Amino acid sequence: MILPITTYTDEVLHQTAKPLKGVDGAVEELIDSMFESMENASGIGLAAPQVGHSLRLLVLDISCMKSYEDVAPMVVINPHILSVKGKNLMEEGCLSVPGVQGDVQRPSSITLKYRDRNFLEQTEEFSGMLARVLQHEIDHLSGTLFIDRMEKRDRRKIQKELDDIAKGNIEVDYPLARACSRDGGGAICM
């Protein structure tokens, strides 16, 4: 099932996601829906908060990219970055911040401890685009967006686009969720 993507103003994207205690039928269904939603939106990574679920879960598939055709799709549960190496500045975008790109500096390689789709613990080193996509999606699980990592002067340059997204003045080829945030006692949805 294709799920709507939350936009950057949605509260769930600014919260620390909760760890999963296992994989049951509901989580399996969510994983399948996340892959379907990511593919429908022409994305290469998607975190559970981006579809409204505050869970430490992400999926990615970079096999559509040149030089990464042999990289298998991944399910990453409860990730924890153990170590990082190097630095790399690269332009990023995000399904939750449609139409906006910006330069973000990240480590060029990471050692990651996580659980896979079968909830088996894995520890692996990742580099290049795979490391970047993993870090971008893991940020979502901590309530951080790529725009939060941009230099302030660069962020000011995209403020109009961010305002348009907040107002719903955007067109995308995938479903978007209504953004909701808390204000005092009630929810405000835009």
From Swiss-Prot:
Positions annotated to bind Fe cation: 94, 136, 140
Enzyme class, UniProt record, top EC level: hydrolase
Pfam families tied to this protein: Pep_deformylase
Catalytic residues (positions): 137
SUPFAM superfamilies: Peptide deformylase
Cofactor note: Binds 1 Fe(2+) ion.
Disulphide bonds in the chain: none
Reactions the enzyme catalyzes: N-terminal N-formyl-L-methionyl-[peptide] + H2O = N-terminal L-methionyl-[peptide] + formate
Keywords: Hydrolase, Iron, Metal-binding, Protein biosynthesis
Top-rank lineage group of the source organism: Bacteria
The protein's required cofactors: Fe(2+)
GO MF term list: metal ion binding; peptide deformylase activity
GO biological process, any: translation
CDD domains: Pep_deformylase (cd00487)
Its EC number(s): 3.5.1.88
Cell division as UniProt keyword: no
Gene3D superfamilies in the record: Peptide deformylase
Free-text function comment from the UniProt entry: Removes the formyl group from the N-terminal Met of newly synthesized proteins. Requires at least a dipeptide for an efficient rate of reaction. N-terminal L-methionine is a prerequisite for activity but the enzyme has broad specificity at other positions.
Family: Belongs to the polypeptide deformylase family.
NCBIfam families the UniProt entry points to: pept_deformyl, PRK00150.1-3
Protein name: Peptide deformylase
Lineage per the UniProt record: Bacteria, Pseudomonadati, Chlorobiota, Chlorobiia, Chlorobiales
The encoding gene: def
